Amino acid sequence: MNSLDLPKPPHETRVVVAMSGGVDSSVVAGLLKREGYDVVGVTLQLYDHGAATHRKGACCAGRDIHDARAVAETLGIPHYVLDYEDRFRESVIDRFAESYLSGETPIPCVECNRSVKFRDLLGLARDLGAEALATGHYVASRARPEGGRALYRALDPARDQSYFLYATTPEQLAYLRFPLGERPKDETRALARELGLAVADKADSQDICFVPQGGYADVIAKLRPEATRPGEIVDLDGRRLGEHEGIIHYTVGQRRGLKLSAGEPLYVVRLEPETARVVVGPRAALATRRIRLTDLNWLGDGAPEDIAERPVAVRVRSTREPRPARLSWNAAEACAEVELLVPEDGVSPGQACVIYADDDPRAQVLGGGTIRRIGALQAGAAEAA
C-alpha cells in the first residue's frame, strides 16, 4: 500500500486535489506531487466573487482562484476551474436563507461539503480517472479491517474540522483522503515555505464564504425580502417586551442587540417564524438536555436502528468540545435522540449535532444529524429552567 492506503505505487496513482487557494490544500497538492503521485488540481468557483475578490477571510473567490492557479504552476500540475455557482446557490445559499426564515441557525459549510464538494467534485474526480480525492481538511481517516474507512478527529485539536464533515457518507469516505489530519498547522505552513509556495503566509479563511464580514442578515434580506418582517419580542409567558425588525437578526442564545430594559439579563430562547415572535428569557431557560436529530448520517458499526442506548460524546457547536451523552433510536419517529448528561446552553435548531465514540481528542466520528426544534428540545429547556 502507498501512503494513501492505495495499492498502486504513487507514479501509477492519479489523485485529484480540491484546491481552494489556501495554504492547506496547496500543501496537500505539493506533498502528493513530491511523493510522486499523478496530481490534478481542481478549484470550484462557488459564488459571484466580484465583491469578494479582495476580501480577507473568504474562500473560493477571485483571489483564491488566482492563488490556486499560481500554486499549480509552481508545482507543475494541471489545474482546472469549474463554475459551480448555480449548484452552490441552489444547494447551499437558498437553503441557508430558507433555514433562517424557519427560525433555524444553519451551518452552510456542512451543506456545502455534503451537497457540492463531496458529491459533485467526487464524481468529477472519478471521471478524471483518479483513485482518490484529497482535500486540505484537518480530519483523519483510517482503513477499517473489514473494509472502508473510519473518520477521526484531527491531531491538531485547534484545527479539527470533524464537526463540518460528519455528513460525509461511508461511500464518500472510502474515496476521500485527508493528508493533513495527522499534522499540526505550524508544520503545514513550514511545508508550504519548504515547497516554495507563495501562499505560505496567507491568512486562513474565517467567514462564511458568501457572507461579507459576517453580515448574513443582509444576504438573507436581499434573497428573501420578506425576511425583514417585523414582530414582537416576548418573554416566556408571552408578555410583550419590545419589537424587532425580523427574526433573521437573532439566534438562540443571543444576548446582544435585544435593546430591552429588564431587571435581569435576557437571552433569545427560541424563534417563532409563524408568528414572527422572538421569545426571550433568563439564561437558565437556555439549558437543553434532550435533542432530536433528523437527516442522521451514521458512520459507526451496524445500523442506527439497532442503537439501544449507547454512551457517546456529542458536539452541538463547532467551538465547543464534545460532551458526554447517551444516544438512542426513536423507532416511532424514525430518528435519533440524544440525552446530554450535562445540559447545554444555546442549542439551536438547524445546527449540527456531531456524535463521537467518546470525548478523547482523537475520537472516532460516529456521525451526526441536524438539530430540529421539537417538543423534546423545548421540554429539556423547561426542565432545566
UniProtKB/Swiss-Prot annotation:
Main subcellular localisation = cytoplasm
Q: List the disulfide bonds.
A: 112-209
Q: Which keywords does the record carry?
A: ATP-binding, Cytoplasm, Disulfide bond, Nucleotide-binding, RNA-binding, Transferase, tRNA processing, tRNA-binding
The residues annotated as the active site are 112, 209
Q: What is its EC number?
A: 2.8.1.13
| One GO BP | tRNA wobble position uridine thiolation
A Gene Ontology molecular function term for this protein is: ATP binding
Q: Which NCBIfam families match?
A: PRK00143.1, trmU
According to UniProt, the name of this protein is tRNA-specific 2-thiouridylase MnmA
Q: Which organism is it from?
A: Methylorubrum extorquens (strain PA1) (Methylobacterium extorquens)
